[in-house]
Amino acid sequence: MRIIGIDPGLARVGYGIIDEIEGKKIMIDCGIIETKSTKKEEERLVEISNDLSSIIKKWNPNSAAVEKFFFYRSSTTISVVQARGVIMMTLGKYKLPIQEFPPMQIKLAVTGYGHSDKNEVLNCVMHELSITSPPKPDDAADALAIALTGIYLK
């Protein structure tokens, strides 16, 4: 099984690719799709879709896991929701089964505690994937946690 985990955003979309082979989880790739704030929003959304398509074509995942948001009066809400919609559409274009998880469920799945801080989640991700250096930037590390959640809760 190969899964892509995605941490949505307009400025930065984190992604992480993990293989699960006979119960062992192996990090294949992780990184970010970054868009410049100087571009028009519609150009940034197209860039996210195009870059995500390239990642999907390169790594050919079997499924996807995406962080689900619940916003309350945030100025970034609309932009992030639009980016998330483009991400969901792009995943759908490749007919990938999609799992969605809120942040607390991701923390619970990865650490066993739904109110864990970022360092606890990061340590568990590094341990589970047998990696010695923290994935950078944080969005990529978060995407790996989302992918692990997709594996654990499949």
From Swiss-Prot:
Major localisation: cytoplasm
GO biological process annotation, one example: DNA recombination
A GO cellular-component term linked to this record: cytoplasm
Cofactor note: Binds 2 Mg(2+) ion per subunit.
Gene this chain is encoded by: ruvC
Source organism superkingdom: Bacteria
Its EC number(s): 3.1.21.10
PANTHER family on file: CROSSOVER JUNCTION ENDODEOXYRIBONUCLEASE RUVC
The protein's name: Crossover junction endodeoxyribonuclease RuvC
